[in-house]
Amino acid sequence: MEVTFFGTSAGLPTKERNTQSIALNLEPYSNSIWLFDVGEGTQHQILRHSIKLGKIDHIFITHMHGDHIFGLPGLLTSRSFQGGENKPLTIIGPKGIQNYIETSLQLSESHLNYPITYIEINQQLAYHHNGFTVQAEMLNHGIPSFGYRIEAPITPGTINVEALRGIGLEPGPKYQEVKLQETFEYKGLIYNSDDFKGKAKPGPIISIFGDTKPCENEYELAKNSDLMIHEATYIEGDKKLANNYHHSHIDDVFNLIKQANVNKSLITHISNRYNIDEVTSIYNELSLDQTSPHFYFVKDFDTFKI
């Protein structure tokens, strides 16, 4: 799996940063792409990347502020002509997302050639798809804003060929049953599959946050994440200012990383008040502090393996 950032700015675009959008490539579990937020200009950013709109089969919206949704109507329309024909799309987000999209398409007389399934979140959501589990919880941003916890499928343990041969079962189609099922039958006997394969490997856990100031649900979403993607609109200065606007300060994110035992953290949604050089300087200063956790300020088009 890997994650690519198509927009990393907060509120307004800058010359270096587009507004928010994150792509999650599900390979090797699936050849699908999941998109988180679609700020204005997202489809133009995607044109500069190898990702194709037709491979996007889920879009998750964190909240209804414009820097997270203004790119939706154009991207959805273009998907019809860029490999998305007859390919179903699921859009998950706060209440109002369906009305926003359908009204935009209706008023612009835009027509799609694929079906959309809408799932609007009230307070929380548990969603399952092709072995993936997605948990959504309400954050604290002044309007409904959600964070998503994505747990990838468990990879079954490797088949122990010698152990299976020990009961007389040679390699063949039956091995797939041993690999995927809890028990299997052979010559009238029922066997426990775990006795004939190695330990299953849990898939990575990724937590992706919408805009928020610190709140209780953050911990539940972030705990033991292999990768956390979080906003830090304010990366220096007065923390009270960030929280007054229902946003996070970098110190808030650091506290969450430590409390939730996060392995790796990528920081996005950086205020347009900071240019690239200033972000680099602040990053270098924070990195020198030995109490700082593992983190990175992302830029547009950054891609990270998970």
Curated annotation (Swiss-Prot):
The gene is rnz. Binds 2 Zn(2+) ions. Zn(2+) 1 binds at H63, H65, H141, D211. Zn(2+) 2 binds at D67, H68, D211, H269. SUPFAM superfamilies: Metallo-hydrolase/oxidoreductase. GO terms for molecular function: 3'-tRNA processing endoribonuclease activity; zinc ion binding. Zinc phosphodiesterase, which displays some tRNA 3'-processing endonuclease activity. Probably involved in tRNA maturation, by removing a 3'-trailer from precursor tRNA. Keywords: Endonuclease, Hydrolase, Metal-binding, Nuclease, tRNA processing, Zinc. The keyword tRNA-binding does not apply. This is Ribonuclease Z.
